[in-house]
């Protein structure tokens, strides 16, 4: 219990000190933090996507205590420093989803991750996919947008 409270306090401290107060509406691109790394990235708010998506490289599925897990590398450019950040993360697979796109149908693992927008931390499901050819490493879908508020497509952060 003590470790959990300490972790929450650290995340809140990182979140609150790095970004401005939570707005009442958001632009179609916002700057947010990926936890637990605390790296600031540009996130695309996509009302056309149901589930959020995260750039994940070198996906490796494995079992831990009989449950499905995934190991992946988060490799992004810090939006505040332009520095490349690379970190290997492991998460339990919540479920697999079938995503329909221009290239056809694809199975993707879904994991729980935390992000910070404004001064709030959100825990959300993210599908993992190599987004290295995409402009934005994080896409926020409608499941999360429903908790955020309005998206103003005429502006960015």
Q: PLM features: what roles do these ranges have?
A:
Residues 19-157:
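Pepsin/retropepsin-fold aspartyl endopeptidases
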Residues 1-9:
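Bacterial N-terminal signal peptides that target proteins for export
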Residues 15-17:
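N-terminal signal peptide c-region/cleavage motif recognized by signal peptidases
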């Amino acid at each position: 219990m003590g470790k959990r409270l300490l972790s929450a306090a650290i995340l809140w401290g990182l979140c609150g000190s790095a970004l401005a107060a939570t707005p009442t509406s958001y632009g179609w691109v916002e700057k947010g933090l990926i936890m637990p790394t605390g790296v600031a990235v540009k996130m695309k708010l996509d009302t056309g996507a149901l589930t959020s998506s995260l750039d994940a490289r070198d996906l490796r599925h494995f079992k831990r205590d009989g449950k499905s897990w995934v190991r992946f590398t988060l490799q992004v450019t810090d939006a505040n420093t332009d520095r490349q950040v690379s970190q290997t993360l492991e998460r339990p697979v919540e479920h697999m989803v079938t995503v329909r796109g221009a290239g056809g149908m694809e199975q993707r693992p879904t994991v729980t991750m935390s992000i910070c927008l404004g001064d709030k931390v959100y825990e959300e499901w993210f599908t993992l996919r190599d987004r290295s050819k995409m402009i934005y490493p994080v896409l926020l879908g409608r499941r999360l947008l429903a908790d955020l508020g309005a998206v103003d497509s005429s502006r960015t952060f």
